[in-house]
């Protein structure tokens, strides 16, 4: 599956500092320590509706990770999936009388357009699940050969007893896991399972549903194994960061980590699990199932996409927050001031801005702190302070390279 066009990223003087991020599994901020090539996997959309601000907030967070690794001198191998066959997609297609493949294709194309508009750096591999069913089946077969699966009425399940470190990613109690499992696509109450937290690897063919041949019969993959297979095929085990929204901590990232562990015999599957906070509207998490969405495609018809990006950057990536129209208005004012400042013939020296932005952003992506640094420089510049003719252009490049905002 094709990705989207990459924006040009300016090269900055010097080299950025090592990036530190909050690892959910460790419960603390720690250094990322990639080799020459940093490896990043970010879970993608289920394409049954347009990209909303919750999605944008997540993908912006990992775009910052990508940019800061590059600034520190690393190549970045970034892989992302699209869950282009799944229950919500099939249900929406049936409700609206559309072919599920056409619905997925249309929403994926809209997602690409939104990501380009927001200047999100594209993945090297953008992989639709339907493109790699054979790879997913091979991984399930490996897990079966290792004794980690069992059959239940033609469906194949992962036996949680085969995962001795289960719970290590989320740190959740079994009670909380069971509650979330039922809310997020699991089936803890299904009769015949060995344990309520055992999860589906392969769903046997059902009437009216798409299916593919496999060593286990006709059917389609479960959700968690899809990302595990795509990450392993492109990045290998022990990649640097697995990322997504905080609603993926459990069960998605927890289950994927143990599929990878059993398959490869290596722990951890990802060196760090990093999660973005949830964006709310009207007091509830923005989600397709609730229908309380602010779509990026609609918002960018009304506002400069760079103002949308700035509105998101005003919140720390791990925080949960509520969207209001006032935030976009404030971002538009900020964007206009910054553009006025970098359009001046001279301004205050910018080397300190570069050092401070690198310090803020490499400390667990402190974007609000970084915005304050640029605000202060712009205020001084617009007040007539500074005589450095190269400063405005350097600040423009700094903001572009590290924050992804084109001025």
From Swiss-Prot:
Cofactor binding comment, as recorded: Binds 1 zinc ion per subunit.
Motif annotated as 'ERGGDP' region, chain positions: 183-188
Cofactor(s) demanded: Zn(2+)
Positions bound to Zn(2+): 43, 227, 252
Catalytic activity annotation: 1D-myo-inositol 2-amino-2-deoxy-alpha-D-glucopyranoside + L-cysteine + ATP = 1D-myo-inositol 2-(L-cysteinylamino)-2-deoxy-alpha-D-glucopyranoside + AMP + diphosphate + H(+)
Family per record: Belongs to the class-I aminoacyl-tRNA synthetase family. MshC subfamily.
Name listed for the protein in its UniProt record: L-cysteine:1D-myo-inositol 2-amino-2-deoxy-alpha-D-glucopyranoside ligase
Taxonomy of the source species: Bacteria, Bacillati, Actinomycetota, Actinomycetes, Streptosporangiales
Gene: mshC
